[in-house]
Amino acid sequence: MKSPNRLLIGGVLATGLTSIPLCGAAAGFEFTPIGSAFSDDGSGSIRLKMPATFGVALQCGISVQGQVDETGVAQVTRVTFSGSTPLCSLITARGLPWNLVAKSTATVYMEHVSFIYPSGPLCGGNTILSSWTPYTQRLLVFNQIVSTGCEVVSMDVKISMLSIKYR
């Protein structure tokens, strides 16, 4: 007679093995058009807190460029900061490419987000949550900690060349 544990494990394995063919490839969302280059419209804005600003939010412009890879991930390969204060132009993006991974038509994970200010430590390297507004094609971020003492308070970037679709 088989023990109850063996029967349970056997049943779980049999159920798992019979369901594998039914699952198929994982469905998901992707940025389109695949293989296309993209850039923002030049009106992007970002508010950052970092040790170099002593926790005060610094308002800057942000510009992004990149390409959608064959898997539907939008890879941001160039980020520039600008603004009316000279401090903004001293911020440098790190960890590029920043991967924009669509989780739904409205949710995007931004991977590898990091930046540095000359007199401060590296901020980031984390994945942060952002929103995508399909009708205005805007990437929005609110109150995302990228590392200790470093935060993206807000970001708004319009990338009219991109859209998200279910694959």
Predicted regions and their residues:
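Bacterial N-terminal signal peptides
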Residues: 10-20
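N-terminal segment immediately downstream of the Sec signal-peptide cleavage site
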Residues: 21-78, 151-167
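Bacterial N-terminal signal peptides that target proteins for export
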Residues: 2-11
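Short, hydrophobic/aromatic-rich segments at coil-to-beta transitions
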Residues: 39-45, 105-111, 137-139
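Predominantly extracellular/secreted and cell-surface proteins with exposed
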Residues: 54-134
